[in-house]
Structure formats: C-alpha cells, structure tokens
C-alpha cells in the first residue's frame, strides 16, 4: 500500500516567495502577503496530498478572525485538520480517527467540529437571520455561526479583557430580533443591540440577591432575568433599571410557608440550580438538592413550592414543548421519567401527579428532555447517550448511532421541529438531521 502524507501550505506564503503551486511535503509556510499582514484577518491555506514524489490532490481553506480575535494555534490546526480530512478520505480510503456521530451515515445527530474542548452551556439563534447564532460555555467560550450551525468561529466580547474572559463560564445566551443578552459566572451580563456585532457590559448591583441564572431577551431594550435566589427582574430600558417581579426570595417564601408541609423545603440551601421559562412567561425551577420544585406565573408575588411526587430526588424539570399549558416533564435519580397532564395548576401547593414511564436507560440518569414536536421526544442520558420516543414520551429506545460520542450530553435545544442541537462536555456539539429520522 502506498504511503500517503498530508502537507499544510500557506498559499499566501507561497505567492509571497514566488513559489509555484506544488506543495512541499510536511512543511508549513507561515508568511503572509503584504495585504494580509496589514489586515491580520485572513490566512488562506492549501492542504496537499502527496506520496513524496507528486501531489495527488489538494483543497484550500480560509482561516479567518473577526472583531480583533486572533486565531489560536488550536483553532488553526482544527481548520487544517478538517481540510486534510476532506483531501484524504476520497483518495486514500484510509481510516481516520473522527467522532462517531460525524462518521456514521444516516445518523439523526451528527457531531459538528468545534475549535474547543470547553463544556457547552447554551445556544441561540437570531429570529431575523435563522442562520446566525451564538454558542457559549466554560473558559470564556464564545462562538458564532452564520451558516445555521454547520461551522463556528471564535469571538470575543469587547468589554471583557482577554485574560479576564478565560475565567468566565458563559451560561446563557438569548436573542430577540437584534437584541441579544449573555450572562455568566463570576457574575457578568452583556448586551448587544445589533445582533451580536457589538457588545456592552451591563453593571450588576452588588446588592443583587444571588447570581444571574437565566436571562431572556423579550424585545428592544427589554429582558427578564432570574437569579439563583429566585429573584425575577424585568428591564425596559436596556438594563439601566430593573423592576422586581416577586416580592421576596425563595428562601423567604419557604420560611414564611414552612408549615405548608412541602417535603424537603426545610433543607433548602438558598439557591436554585436550574430554571426554565416557557413561551407565556411561566417559570419552573429546582433547588440544588432536587427535593422539591417551584413554579412562578406572571402576576404572582411569590414562587409556589411543590412537593416531589416520589421519594427519589428530581434531576431535571421543564415544560412540555416549552408551554406550561401542555404539562410538565421531570426526570428523577436513577433514570426515572414522568409527565403531567395538561393544564396543571401551577399556583396550587397540592402535590402534582406525574405519570412515570419506562425510559429503559438501565439506571443511567436523564440529564435533559426536549420535544421536537408533540410526538417526537429526545432525552440526553448519562454516559453520552441519546434516547428517543416517537409516541409523545410513552415508549423509549436508545439511538445507537450517538451512544459512543465520548462525552456527557447536557442540553437539548430545538428551534422548530427541523433544527436542533445537543450540547455537551469536551466541546461536543451535535446537530439534528431530520432527513435521517
């Protein structure tokens, strides 16, 4: 079998030195043209396939940076490796180490290569341009796409120092028209009014109860924020002023209603770790221990605590199809999964009944659940597996083409029934391919 190697060659460097288009094996030329040195934004590379005597094939790729964000060595190697893969696979037939989800044909979820190994926390797209989106995560990760999530480029926030940004874990991004908001830890909030071209930092009061946990863009200058203490605020002037929507924190509510008999309420540690907002502005949240859950409906002065319906603690909870009128889903320790009937009373302190189903996860915990539509439901299961239901959550089966992705999958998010993403650890991003379902 003929030995084949791949060479990475900077095309601009070749042109600057008067070289011909033939690539030199295993050599990378880093010099750039005068125009490129002036702009500092683009480098065009040619990836060649050579057996040491002649070039068999080549392709080209452009490595580009924007907003003053320099291309890191890792990002550069990522681009070049993808180009090499494009050259090598059709010609050599060689086995290439690549993510399983990307190499299996016909998979409903395929892995999108990313220039990062950070944990991915959130993703959102602009309603004005559905192909334009942002992805955030740990170690200051900020990525932008303009092709619907097929490719992603690193970005940076102007109001956050480069060294400082690496210490942040950006946990939430939300778009509404050109309005965009991002929050993270240590407590930070950023806002854009032009679809993400420019960002400004919103100052947070040191008296803010808790840390920002969720922000939702609602329109021009308008957004809602929930903190880890359960405080809910709304701004209508771009974050200059915030109006409280609840009269007290969750801790104060539980102290006042301790006689309500909510199991586990006395063990509340003072903060919630997960909160979701539906399309009508209703919220649902769970505390760190998962021993009860809480709901809030617009116009209420307080959160309403609810006892869990089983002895096992709640792992995750949310609204069915992001709509409280359609019911609530919950996952419990050990792979339990349950759904309520539609139109449950979120203001009642009576125990809400969940109909439990057999998720067939073998005891592995379910980390998130998302509805593609009213029939097709997906679940992210511990160990990097995806499970699916085609009957509204009644019966489940494992998706074998994604079960060995090699990283935990934490969040599933759909943007309509035909586009969805799964976010995980180690920079794992899966994109939904409805044509394979």
UniProtKB/Swiss-Prot annotation:
Mainly localized where?
Answer: plastid
Q: Does the keyword Transit peptide apply?
A: yes
Biological process according to GO: photosynthesis
Cellular location of this protein? Plastid, Chloroplast thylakoid membrane
Membrane topology term reads: Peripheral membrane protein
Has keyword Membrane?
Answer: yes
What GO terms fall under cellular component here? chloroplast thylakoid membrane; photosystem II
Cross-referenced Pfam families: PSII_BNR
Q: What does this protein do?
A: Essential for photosystem II (PSII) biogenesis; required for assembly of an early intermediate in PSII assembly that includes D2 (psbD) and cytochrome b559.
NCBIfam families this protein is in? PRK13684.1
State the name under which the record lists this protein.
Answer: Photosystem II stability/assembly factor HCF136, chloroplastic
Q: Which organism is it from?
A: Cyanidioschyzon merolae (strain NIES-3377 / 10D)
Q: What are the leading ranks of the lineage?
A: Eukaryota, Rhodophyta, Bangiophyceae, Cyanidiales, Cyanidiaceae
């Amino acid at each position: 079998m003929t030995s084949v190697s791949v060479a990475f060659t900077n095309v601009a460097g070749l042109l600057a030195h008067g070289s011909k288009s033939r690539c030199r094996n295993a050599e990378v030329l880093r010099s750039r043209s005068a125009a490129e040195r002036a702009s500092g934004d683009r480098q065009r590379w040619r990836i060649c396939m050579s057996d040491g005597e002649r070039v068999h094939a080549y392709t080209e790729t452009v490595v580009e940076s924007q907003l003053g964000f320099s291309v890191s060595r890792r990002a550069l190697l990522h681009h070049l490796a993808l180009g090499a893969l494009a050259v090598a696979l059709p010609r050599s037939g060689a086995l290439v180490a690549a993510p399983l989800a990307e190499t299996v044909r016909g998979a409903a979820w395929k892995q999108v290569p990313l220039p990062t190994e950070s944990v991915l926390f959130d993703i959102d797209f602009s309603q004005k341009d559905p192909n334009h989106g942002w992805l955030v995560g740990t170690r200051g990760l900020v990525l932008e796409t303009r092709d619907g999530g097929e490719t992603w480029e690193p970005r940076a926030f102007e109001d956050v120092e480069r060294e400082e940004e690496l210490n942040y874990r950006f946990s939430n991004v939300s778009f509404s028209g050109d309005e965009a908001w991002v929050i993270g830890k240590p407590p930070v909030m950023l806002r854009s009014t032009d679809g993400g071209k420019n960002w400004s930092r919103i100052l947070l009061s040191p008296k803010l109860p808790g840390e920002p946990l969720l922000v939702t863009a609602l329109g021009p200058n308008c957004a809602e924020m929930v903190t880890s203490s359960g405080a809910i605020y709304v701004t209508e002037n771009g974050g200059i002023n915030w109006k409280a929507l609840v009269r007290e924190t969750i801790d104060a509510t539980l102290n006042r209603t301790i006689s309500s008999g909510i199991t586990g309420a006395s063990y509340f540690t003072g903060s919630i770790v997960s909160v979701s907002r539906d399309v009508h502005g209703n919220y649902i949240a769970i505390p760190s221990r998962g021993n009860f859950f809480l709901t809030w409906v617009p116009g209420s002065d307080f959160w309403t605590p609810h006892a869990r319906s089983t002895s096992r603690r709640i792992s995750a909870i949310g609204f069915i199809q992001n709509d409280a009128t359609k019911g609530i889903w919950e996952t419990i320790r050990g792979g339990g999964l349950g759904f309520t009937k539609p139109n449950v009373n979120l203001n009642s302190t009576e125990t809400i009944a969940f109909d439990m189903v057999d998720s067939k996860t073998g005891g592995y915990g379910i980390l998130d659940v998302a509805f593609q539509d009213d029939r097709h439901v997906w679940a992210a299961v511990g160990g990097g597996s995806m499970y699916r239901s085609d009957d509204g959550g009644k019966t489940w089966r494992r998706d074998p083409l994604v079960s060995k992705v090699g990283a935990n999958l934490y969040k599933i998010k759909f943007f309509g029934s035909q586009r969805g993403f799964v976010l995980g650890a180690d920079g794992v991003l899966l994109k939904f391919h409805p044509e394979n379902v």
